[in-house]
C-alpha cells in the first residue's frame, strides 16, 4: 500500500466558521419548531417543556386565543390540546433568517386532530384538520434558541371543529 501523505488539520477560515455557525443556528431554530410540535403530539407540555421552547416573556398567538409569558404556558397548552384524543402536526417549508442573537422563522403546518370520542352514531367520523401558516421570532438564550413569539394563521380547515361536535349517547 503506497504511503499517503498526512495532511495536518487546518482550522476553518473566519468566513467558513461564520457560515457553519449560521447553518447550525438555522438547524437549531428548525429543531425548536419540531420540539414545540412534538411536545403537542406527545402531550408532554409541562413547565420543563414550556421553558424548553419559550423565553420567559414568550408569547403564543392563535386565532382562537393566546398566552403571554412562560408561566402558565403549559396549562394553557394542555387546555387547548386537551380537547382532542390525539393530534398529529406536520410542518414543512421552514424559512429561517438569523440576525445575530435573534431569528425569524416561518413555514406551513398541517395539524390533524382526533375528536375525544371514537366515530359512531351522532359523532363526527372524520378528524378535524387545519392548514396553518406559522411565524415566529426566536432569541438565543444561555440554554439555546427559544421562541419570543409564535403565531399561527389558519389558512383552511376540514372536518368538524371543536365546539360544534354534538354527541348523543344511546
Language-model features and meaning:
Residues 1-46, 52:
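Short, low-complexity N-terminal intrinsically disordered segments enriched in polar/charged residues
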Amino acid at each position: 500500500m503506497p504511503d499517503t501523505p498526512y495532511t495536518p488539520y487546518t482550522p476553518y477560515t473566519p468566513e467558513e466558521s461564520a457560515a457553519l455557525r449560521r447553518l447550525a443556528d438555522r438547524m437549531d431554530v428548525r429543531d425548536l419548531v419540531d420540539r414545540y410540535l412534538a411536545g403537542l403530539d406527545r402531550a408532554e407540555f409541562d413547565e420543563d417543556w414550556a421553558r424548553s421552547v419559550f423565553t420567559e416573556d414568550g408569547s403564543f398567538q392563535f386565532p382562537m386565543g393566546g398566552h403571554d409569558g412562560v408561566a402558565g404556558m403549559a396549562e394553557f397548552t394542555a387546555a387547548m390540546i386537551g380537547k382532542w384524543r390525539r393530534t398529529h402536526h406536520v410542518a414543512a417549508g421552514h424559512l429561517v433568517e438569523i440576525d445575530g442573537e435573534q431569528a425569524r422563522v416561518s413555514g406551513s403546518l398541517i395539524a390533524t386532530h382526533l375528536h375525544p370520542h371514537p366515530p359512531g352514531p351522532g359523532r363526527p367520523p372524520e378528524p378535524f384538520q387545519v392548514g396553518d401558516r406559522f411565524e415566529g421570532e426566536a432569541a438565543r438564550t444561555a440554554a439555546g434558541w427559544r421562541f419570543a413569539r409564535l403565531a399561527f394563521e389558519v389558512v383552511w380547515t376540514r372536518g368538524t371543529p371543536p365546539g360544534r361536535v354534538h354527541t348523543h349517547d344511546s
